[in-house]
A protein has these predicted regions:
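Transmembrane alpha-helix boundary/anchor motif
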Residues: 51, 59, 118, 200, ...
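Hydrophobic, glycine- and aromatic-enriched re-entrant/interface helices and adjoining loop segments
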Residues: 89, 93-95, 183-272, 293-296, ...
Length: 319
């Protein structure tokens, strides 16, 4: 019978809860205001996320570590099934429809916990030596990062695949890989980047890069700038947030939600959200010193911290 380790209550990290709860609450309020249907879905996802957190918190994950490879390969199978059973939207197959419901499942999203756990499992079983992982171990770990990367990129969803790629290798960088390997990778990437851009990227992917680097903002970015300016210092009431209320601000529930955050809560509200994210990321990464030899926990907190940092940075920079 599985028993709950009572020590987890004495070592509970209250800082994470204090930082995560207001972020979730602000997100739920904003999405609900912008779109009631999506707000209801956001509430369901928040509840499911809380239950998943509670499950991971109470279960002795290390005693059940033998299940982690099984979960990883189940999720790989789901990624493979997208090509056969996937629902196509806007020219991409990224979702699986849940039978008898109106909900869809995005395997690339639910893959993330098993991805983190698999890296933690592998590194916990064979920690890095003093000078970092050598080429053989690095290649083995890279396989578990590159396999889902290529599957997700082929959907096509290069954005999610790239995030997974950065988190995976970013975690290895923090945990420890021999510096000669990183120098070699840097040279290969620097030389091959122009060829990849010219021959492998699709036109819309090139356009996104061009729009991001362009001095002249796109229509969507112009509308987000107007929304940010409309918010002022303290923000506007919901009915006075005209950019979102009259649908000028595109995709205000996801891509441009930070612009809506400032339109509603002003510069002060936007600064508060950024401050909460900054504290959460620094707190997670600072746990490296406290955990030290506990590689399972170190991999988990580093990967989660990197995920949060990348998504927060991308969403803010788009605005």
């Amino acid at each position: 019978m599985i028993s709950i380790d009572k020590r987890i209550f004495t070592h509970f990290d209250f800082v994470q809860v204090v930082l995560v709860v207001p972020i979730c609450a602000i997100s739920l309020v904003l999405v609900w205001e912008a779109n009631t249907f999506l707000g209801e879905k956001q509430l369901i996802y928040t509840i499911v996320g809380f239950l998943a957190w509670l499950l991971f918190f109470l279960l002795p994950i290390r005693k059940l570590a033998w299940l982690i490879p099984f979960l990883y390969w189940i999720n790989i199978a789901l990624l493979l099934s997208v090509d056969i059973f996937g629902v196509e939207r806007l020219g991409a197959k990224r979702w699986l429809e849940i039978p008898f419901t109106h909900f869809t499942l995005q395997p690339s999203e639910i893959f993330k916990p098993s991805f983190i756990l698999m890296l933690a499992y592998l590194i916990y079983r064979k920690p890095p030596p003093k000078n970092g992982y050598k080429l053989k171990d690095f290649c083995k770990l890279s396989f578990y990062i590159l396999l889902p990367f290529f599957l997700i990129a082929s959907e096509p969803d290069l954005g999610s695949a790239t995030v997974l790629f950065i988190v995976g290798f970013g975690t290895l960088f923090i945990i420890g890989v021999n510096y000669k390997i990183w120098l070699s990778i840097f040279l290969v990437v620097a030389i091959s980047s122009p060829l990849v851009y010219a021959n492998l990227l699709k036109p819309y992917q090139k356009q996104r890069i061009h729009d991001f680097l362009s001095e002249k903002p796109s229509y969507q970015v112009q509308q987000s700038i107007i929304a940010i300016g409309n918010g002022g210092l303290r923000g506007k009431a919901h009915e006075e947030a005209t950019q979102t209320h009259f649908k000028f601000l595109p995709i205000s529930t996801s891509d441009f939600i930070f612009a809506y955050t400032i339109e509603r809560f002003g510069f002060m509200g936007g600064a508060l959200v950024l401050f909460l994210y900054m504290l959460l990321i620094f707190h997670l990464l600072s746990l490296n010193r406290k955990l030290r030899g506990d590689y399972f926990a170190r991999v988990a907190v580093n990967a989660v911290g990197l995920f949060i940092f990348i998504y927060a940075a991308v969403n803010v920079s788009m605005n």
